[in-house]
């Protein structure tokens, strides 16, 4: 697992390219009313590629997402082949705010970024980014910047 986001910083930030944001929004729209999920590849706070992944949960995809071990390994391999790291993941919250749930808290890993998009009645809305505290007690909201980064999407 490998982000190089600095865990000792007081303020965390993440930079997403506008095309990445559009890909996340489109994925959320297409998956609705289910949760979508995907990987964020890049360096540090810079996301250089968004990789859509399958939601493989058996627990009810309207309220949960699960990334299979094979898809996780494929995302790590893609990042490695590009000389990059797995910076984090994104997922949608259908008809709920773009805030981490208790389930998100229980299943997150420190050092990774978690982007959440709210999708209400099929329309993507608020986009937020979060990082789990080292003691796993809660999330800290990250500053999310949308700007040019020369990113690819898929």
Model-derived regions, located:
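Conserved beta-strand-loop surface patch within small alpha/beta domains used
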Residues: 1-86, 94-154
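Conserved, mostly hydrophobic/aromatic
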Residues: 89
């Amino acid at each position: 697992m490998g982000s190089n986001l600095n865990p000792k910083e007081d303020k965390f930030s993440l930079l997403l390219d506008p095309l990445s944001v559009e890909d996340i929004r489109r994925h959320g729209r297409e998956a609705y009313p289910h949760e979508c999920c995907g990987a964020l590849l890049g360096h540090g706070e810079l996301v250089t590629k968004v990789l859509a992944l399958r939601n493989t949960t058996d627990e009810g995809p309207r309220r949960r997402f699960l990334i299979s071990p094979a898809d996780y390994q494929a995302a790590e391999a893609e990042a490695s082949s590009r000389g990059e790291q797995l910076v984090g993941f994104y997922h949608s919250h259908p008809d709920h705010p773009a805030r981490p749930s208790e389930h998100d808290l229980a299943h997150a890993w420190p050092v990774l970024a978690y982007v959440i998009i709210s999708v209400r009645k099929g329309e993507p809305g608020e986009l937020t980014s979060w990082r789990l505290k080292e003691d796993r007690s809660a999330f800290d909201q990250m500053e999310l910047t949308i700007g040019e980064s020369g990113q690819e999407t898929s």
